Amino acid sequence: SWIFDDRPDSLKKFYGWTGMYGLPRSLWAGADGTLRMRPVKELETLRRKEQVKSNFIVKEGWEFKLNGFGHELLELEITVQLGKATGAGVMVDCSDDQREQTSIAYDASEKQLIFDAGKSSLDLGRRNIESAPFELKKDENLILRVFVDKGIVEVFANDRQAIGRCVYPRLGGTGVKLFAKGGDIRVLSVKAWELTASNPY
């Protein structure tokens, strides 16, 4: 996939590029004939320092902070049981003062995966909301895989949808928070890994 550089045109000319490749993906046809996608398995070799938190409730309207889970190079795997809730999501790159954060959510009523960059950066980039069609099946858990590479954030939802953006945080925040909408959610598991560099130099 291609991730566009959302900085002003003058900066694109100065730095000499207008975007970058996203993570390599495996693509295949599902049993229903629709496209499936996930990050290639080889990326798992970059994982370091696994952390796990399992089986807890996030109340509607809460922002549940995952202390110690954040890092500037990060992979998250989040499995959520929605129950009667209408949405659930995660915020990454959260600054301590909450002025910067990038929000990723599933909206069951709108049947969308939503990437909200409205508070991603105090400085650069498009402060807008990007969405993609996505719907959970009956009784299906929400599985989000989120990758943070400093200013690049990519999310994969249940192997069926993905969004990637440059977000340009300026405050150095690495906080991670979960949230629920329209009801409480049960988080079956959150796994987090710090990621090492893919190049040895």
Regions found by a protein language model. Give the residues of each.
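Beta-rich accessory regions
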Residues: 1-201
